[in-house]
């Protein structure tokens, strides 16, 4: 299990605000319920609602502190939905009471219901959702994509989809070296015949090895699959997570959380981006938010 870090809560405005308000609302409901139970007959199921919400708040504090909301999001939403029913029912029966203590308890349950709705909206959405990405962008200590638990839970690698044609993935001619071809170099554009079309003079290709063609780059100068880079980057995006490029793919680009990137095209799931230092490459769009 991930280690509990108080900085995950203190550095996350959303977590700090919702947890603080939920604790305050729970205390209001709890203390007012004690007073109301002494003064008049208090509904027993509201005590169960208070006990249940205590467990939910403790669980949410643990979840925010360990930054494992993306792991247990489905279970959290289920528990919150049950809690919303309990708090809403209690609020409806207490807010209309004649005693001030019962009305105060009802107000506490109303605040709890409002916080639960916010939590359901947050945990019930995927990390790629726009509103969740915006909320997480203010957090200082969110779990990084390089962590094993992060890669195993986020749908980045399994469901993100294939990349569109980019710098080195366009349909460019396949280039081979002379050693790879083993002497079967083609001296003409005709495909399927080593050395050119049938009947062509094979001796005509001999000067190619001694006199380089000025219009053809020398050996070692040809870039495999090279396509001109885009010259305009009209969009600006902010990284909501850090991303480490795949070492096996030279097209990907690494960037840090909160880093500002320039983007040339935002139509696909992989965006052609340029960093402030001039490095260019492709970046996953669900790690970025447009400015």
Curated annotation (Swiss-Prot):
Top-rank taxon, per record: Eukaryota
Membrane topology annotation: Multi-pass membrane protein
Cytoplasmic side: 1-14, 66-70, 125-291
Glycosylation sites: 44
Extracellular side: 36-44, 92-103
Cellular compartments per GO CC: plasma membrane
Domain SH3: 232-291
Annotated keywords: Cell membrane, Glycoprotein, Membrane, SH3 domain, Stress response, Transmembrane, Transmembrane helix
Regions that span the bilayer: 15-35, 45-65, 71-91, 104-124
Signal peptide (residue range): none
Locations listed in the record: Cell membrane
GO BP, one annotated term: regulation of actin filament polymerization
Region described as Disordered: 145-173, 187-231
Cited function: Plasma membrane osmosensor that activates the high osmolarity glycerol (HOG) MAPK signaling pathway in response to high osmolarity.
PANTHER family linked: FCH AND DOUBLE SH3 DOMAINS PROTEIN, HIGH OSMOLARITY SIGNALING PROTEIN SHO1
Family membership noted in the UniProt record: Belongs to the SHO1 family.
Assembly description: Forms homooligomers.
Protein name, UniProt field: High osmolarity signaling protein sho1
Organism of this sequence: Penicillium rubens (strain ATCC 28089 / DSM 1075 / NRRL 1951 / Wisconsin 54-1255)
């Amino acid at each position: 299990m991930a280690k509990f870090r108080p900085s995950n809560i203190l550095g996350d405005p959303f977590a700090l605000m919702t947890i603080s308000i939920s604790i305050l609302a729970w205390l209001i409901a709890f203390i007012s319920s004690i007073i109301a139970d002494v003064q008049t007959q208090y509904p027993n199921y509201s005590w169960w609602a208070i006990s249940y919400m205590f467990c939910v708040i403790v669980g949410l504090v643990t979840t925010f502190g360990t930054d494992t909301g993306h792991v247990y999001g489905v279970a959290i939403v289920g528990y919150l939905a049950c809690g919303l029913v309990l708090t809403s029912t209690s609020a409806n029966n207490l807010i209309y009471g004649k005693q001030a203590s019962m009305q105060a308890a009802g107000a506490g349950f109303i605040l709890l219901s409002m916080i639960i709705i916010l939590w359901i909206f947050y945990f019930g959405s995927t990390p790629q959702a726009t509103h969740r990405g915006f909320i997480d962008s203010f957090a200082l200590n969110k779990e990084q994509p390089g962590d094993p638990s992060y890669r195993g839970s986020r749908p980045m690698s399994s469901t993100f989809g294939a990349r569109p044609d980019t710098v080195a993935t366009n349909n460019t001619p396949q280039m081979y070296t002379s050693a790879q071809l083993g002497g079967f170099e083609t001296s003409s554009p005709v495909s399927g015949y080593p050395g050119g079309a049938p009947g062509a003079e094979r001796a005509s290709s001999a000067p190619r090895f001694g006199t380089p063609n000025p219009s053809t780059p020398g050996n070692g100068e040809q870039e495999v699959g090279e396509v001109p880079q885009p010259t305009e980057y009209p969009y600006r995006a902010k990284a909501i997570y850090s991303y480490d490029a795949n070492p096996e793919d030279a097209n990907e680009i690494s960037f840090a959380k909160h880093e500002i990137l320039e983007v040339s095209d935002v139509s696909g799931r992989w965006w052609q981006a340029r960093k402030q230092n001039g490095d260019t490459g492709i970046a996953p769009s669900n790690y970025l938010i447009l400015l």
